Amino acid sequence: VHCESLEELRKLWFGENSSSIRQNPDADQSVEESFLDKETEFALELNNTSLYEEYLRQLLKDFLASYWQKNYLTHSWLAGRTPERFYIGNQFCHNLFPTEEQLFSIMDKMRSEGLEITLAFSYIREFMLPSVGKLLEKVDNWCCIHGMNVEIVVNDWAVAEMLHGKTSHLCPVFGTLLNKRKKDPRMKYKSGDISLFQQNSLNAEFYRDFLAEEFHIHRYEWESCGYPQEFPPGKNSLHLPFYQTNTSQYCPLYALCTTGDRGTQQLAEHCPKFCEKYALLYPEHLHMMGRYNSLFGVDKTFLESPEMWKKIKGIKPDRIVVNL
């Protein structure tokens, strides 16, 4: 199936005719009940300009109703609960972080609504170092004034170093770009022992100790990516249903829109936000799409079968992060 738009693709993946919505009478309802009883923290990502603007424009309940409706997940088991936390920013594209004015407006609104806050930073290019350092200082000051703690998702070692010397109000988190593992929607076509993929570097105790001692990192960001993972001791956040497979600082979508050739890539110094209107589409059976500077796969495992939560080996994530 070849879809004509991202909207059509989302409807095919998550709409009423999708197994993501259909209720399985044999499903273990205890998982959904424990989720609704808040045994696991629940968060949503605000990761692009349109979401920043919609959140600022609407009351929380109206924003959530619109969010689930636009993504065809109104009847999903996830939609039955109000998030306790929001992620602000994009882990994969530096041009999709909100403006400073937007950021503090969003943070003020979240504080008034009793929400916890996580700021997600991408890779940091050399020219960004001074501005990011100053922004972290302003966020630190905001936290001190309001008596709040804010998590900082780190996807560049420079940001981890910047957080040294800041107050305990800024809590570094190990981001997706640094938490590397093999991810590809085509892996389901491969034969072999997938158990070899279940662990990565964070399963090594000495590495976790290094992150804790050197950078005070105790939480790790993961993605649901189509096969079982063995999560390490500590605090683990699981992002779903989309997982990143490729990221380029030289945006292929920008190249395609400006030159007609996605291979003619260059740094988008003045980004016109083509990604607000356009995406790269692939045949539906591949379960993947291209958005802004990255490729993403979709893993509907937990949307379709929440009982799969019980099949996670080892430590279970203590936070679910929805990234539609």
Q: Model-found features: residue ranges?
A:
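Active-site pocket-lining/capping segments in soluble small-molecule metabolic enzymes
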Residues: 1-106, 112-324
